[in-house]
């Protein structure tokens, strides 16, 4: 019954995984069970989220010592090019195998208000989870300037294709 009320597309993903492993974009209700099983193959706990249309922006946060405020880097933006092999979303294939399909733009092309919003929200998210050390907060920035937190990643990638190191 709950599936009848969902707005598609949906994204089904493991609750505790990285690198976009096990994530499926679901366009039709009948594809939902297979997507849930794909996510469960990675983690028994599964999230189902409504798809959000927006630019993908990431913000690196580094925890301070004691009462020091966390440091927040300039936001970076993931820009994908389907003509060079990017998938429908920033999936494992696009992140690690379709290098020509992704451009990491840092600093992100944001308005001053959008920049302030994602940076302050990233710091708030870091503090809300009791963050320590490094974290990356991923957003969707919508056409009307809203910033929607996609996830808080407490183990951001450090590969040659990862955004976190570029943001500092």
What are these regions (language model features)?
Residues 2, 109-168:
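ATP-dependent carboxylate activation and anion-phosphoryl transfer catalytic cores
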Residues 19-20, 101-104, 159-164:
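Short small-residue beta-strand/loop micro-motif enriched in glycine and branched aliphatics
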Residues 3-23, 44-54:
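ATP-grasp fold ATP-binding core
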Residues 14, 79, 94-96, 153-156:
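Short, small-residue-rich loop/turn micro-motifs
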Residues 5-9, 56-58, 136, 149:
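Broad gene-expression machinery/nucleic-acid interaction feature
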Residues 27-120, 141-148:
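Phosphate-binding site of ATP-dependent enzymes
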